[in-house]
């Protein structure tokens, strides 16, 4: 908010109350769109000609080369590969990004591996590659263009808006919010990928993405730290039916802080440094893309706070189940039971980012108290995990240690576990320690696996435990 206000003061004031752009209607520069604390500057969005929004259609039949379609030229749709019996997913980029190639096309191609779909990449680069404040105002025109295309699909081709899914990253999240508002919430689904904070957070619902914009709105927050001083580009405000906050929503694993991120101006980010400066912000669309091919690896846990989630207070999933973050969030039966449902999960730091959550309880056995740490690995019918530290400190016989772990692979049905301990101290008496019982509980369904052993082992020697 503060950054938008500062930038606004540096620009000249534009007079007038509204500007009209033909079939898209008129756009006011008065409240709540402008003249607010978060948006003090009364400027207009650019014209459709200046923004030059393009709709690039990819389908299973043309996964590599787009077909440009236009709402003002319906024949471009009729003679394209657009299929009326398929769902249509629009993907909209954000600030200084583009709609051709890159992550948008990659997301389409992942969709083609799991479904027959019309995938439309929305390119509004000419409207996004300007000062941030102007780009934020331009989102209204881009949203209007999308809404008009959906209306043409409905009136000219009988295609229901309920079959439309709008996906938007950063400023693109508010673009699709505007489109949904103009379609009076009849769009089937909207997904906001780290909706942009500056010029939007705290504003009335008609200005930003909100749950009334679609029949179902899901949001992934990955950069929700305050814009000042942490340069968090994303909203912390909950704006969907389901609001996912992976890793707490502020700092993503694998995104390292750097000195540049503390001094760079949002209007000065250049394309080649996006991953360097905005790593957290970009994680949202990377998580979504990965979820398409890994539907079970992003299970979220409804919880009131990340602290409670980390304390395992929201584990396992309740009887009604847990929602999946990303592509399959709409499979959750309770998705629209209420708005602003808060969901937490942890992810990996690289690769496909997937994780599976378990609660592990270890009961120790041995002759005397030792100090050190204990590790446990899970072995299942789908593979085995790496070793995870369960406890570090005083290791007392009969003591029980509990910890939740986020496992790097889906091991499936757990068949055995392996225990290891170490204190990294040379001991001539070669003491032994073991696990008499290890209980593993799955977060998905609460199922418990119990493993037992009467053995003890020396440090750095694996102990295998089998079902009791």
Curated annotation (Swiss-Prot):
Top-level taxon: Eukaryota
- What species is this protein from? Rattus norvegicus
Q: Supply the gene name.
A: Pnliprp2
Query: What are the binding positions for Ca(2+) in this chain?
Result: 205, 208, 210, 213
Q: Name one GO molecular function term.
A: phospholipase activity
Name the residues annotated as catalytic in the UniProt entry: 170 (nucleophile), 194 (charge relay system), 281 (charge relay system)
Q: InterPro entries, per this entry? A: AB_hydrolase_fold, Lipase, Lipase_LIPH, Lipase_N, Lipase_panc, PLAT/LH2_dom, PLAT/LH2_dom_sf, TAG_lipase
Q: Which EC main class describes this enzyme?
A: hydrolase
Region Required for galactolipase activity: start-end pairs: 92-104, 256-278
> Where, by residue number, does the polypeptide cross the bilayer?
none
Q: What is its EC number?
A: 3.1.1.26, 3.1.1.3
Give all residue intervals belonging to the PLAT domain.
356-468
Signal peptide (UniProt feature, chain positions): 1-16
Q: Which PROSITE patterns match?
A: LIPASE_SER, PLAT
- Quote the protein name from its UniProt record: Pancreatic lipase-related protein 2
Compartments (UniProt record): Secreted; Zymogen granule membrane; Cell projection, Neuron projection
UniProt KW Thylakoid keyword: no
How does pH shape activity?
Optimum pH is 7-8 (lipase activity in the presence of bile salts) and 7.0-7.25 (lipase activity in the absence of bile salts).
Which BP terms in the Gene Ontology apply to this protein? Answer: cellular defense response; cholesterol homeostasis; fatty acid biosynthetic process; galactolipid catabolic process; high-density lipoprotein particle remodeling; intestinal lipid catabolic process; phosphatidylcholine catabolic process; phospholipid catabolic process
Query: Where are the annotated glycans?
Result: 352, 427
| Pathway(s) per entry | Glycerolipid metabolism; triacylglycerol degradation; Glycolipid metabolism
């Amino acid at each position: 908010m503060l950054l938008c206000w500062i930038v606004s003061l540096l620009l000249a004031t534009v007079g007038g109350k509204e500007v009209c752009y033909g079939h898209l209607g008129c756009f006011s520069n008065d409240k709540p769109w402008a003249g607010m604390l978060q948006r003090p500057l009364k400027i207009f969005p650019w014209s459709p000609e200046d923004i030059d929004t393009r709709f690039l259609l990819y389908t299973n039949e043309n996964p590599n080369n787009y077909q440009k379609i236009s709402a003002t030229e319906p024949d471009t749709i009729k003679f394209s590969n657009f299929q009326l019996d398929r769902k249509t997913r629009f993907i909209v980029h954000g600030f200084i990004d583009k709609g051709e190639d890159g992550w948008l096309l990659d997301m389409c191609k992942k969709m083609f591996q799991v479904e027959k779909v019309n995938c439309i990449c929305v390119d509004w680069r000419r409207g996004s590659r300007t000062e941030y404040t102007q780009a934020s105002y331009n989102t209204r025109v881009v949203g209007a263009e999308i809404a008009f295309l959906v209306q043409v699909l409905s009136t000219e081709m009988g295609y229901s808006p309920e079959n439309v899914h709008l996906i938007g990253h950063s400023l693109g999240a508010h673009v699709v919010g505007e489109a949904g508002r103009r379609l009076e919430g009849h769009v089937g689904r909207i997904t906001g990928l780290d909706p942009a904070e500056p010029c939007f957070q705290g504003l009335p619902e008609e200005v930003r993405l909100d749950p009334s914009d679609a029949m179902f709105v899901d949001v992934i927050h990955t950069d929700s730290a305050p814009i000042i001083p942490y340069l968090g580009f994303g909203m912390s405000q909950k704006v969907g039916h389901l609001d996912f906050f992976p890793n707490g929503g502020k700092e993503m694993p694998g995104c390292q802080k750097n000195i540049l991120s503390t001094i760079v101006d949002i209007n000065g980010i250049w394309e080649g440094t996006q991953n360097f400066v905005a790593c957290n912000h970009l994680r949202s669309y990377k998580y979504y893309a990965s979820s398409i091919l890994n539907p079970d690896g992003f299970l979220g846990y409804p919880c009131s706070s990340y602290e409670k989630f980390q304390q395992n207070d929201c584990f396992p999933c309740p009887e009604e189940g847990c929602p999946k973050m990303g592509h399959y969030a709409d499979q959750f039966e309770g998705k629209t039971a209420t708005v602003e449902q808060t969901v937490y999960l942890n992810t990996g730091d690289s690769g496909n980012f997937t994780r599976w959550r378990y609660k592990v309880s270890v009961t120790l056995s041995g002759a005397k108290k030792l100090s050190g740490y204990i590790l446990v690995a899970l072995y299942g019918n789908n593979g085995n995990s790496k070793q995870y530290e369960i406890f570090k400190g005083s290791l007392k016989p009969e003591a029980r240690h509990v910890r939740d772990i986020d496992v790097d692979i889906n091991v499936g049905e757990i068949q055995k576990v392996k225990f290891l301990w170490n204190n990294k101290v040379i001991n001539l008496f070669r003491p032994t320690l073991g696990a008499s019982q290890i209980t593993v509980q799955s977060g998905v369904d609460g199922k418990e696996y119990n493993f037992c052993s009467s053995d003890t082992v020396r440090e750095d020697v694996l102990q295998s435990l089998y079902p009791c």
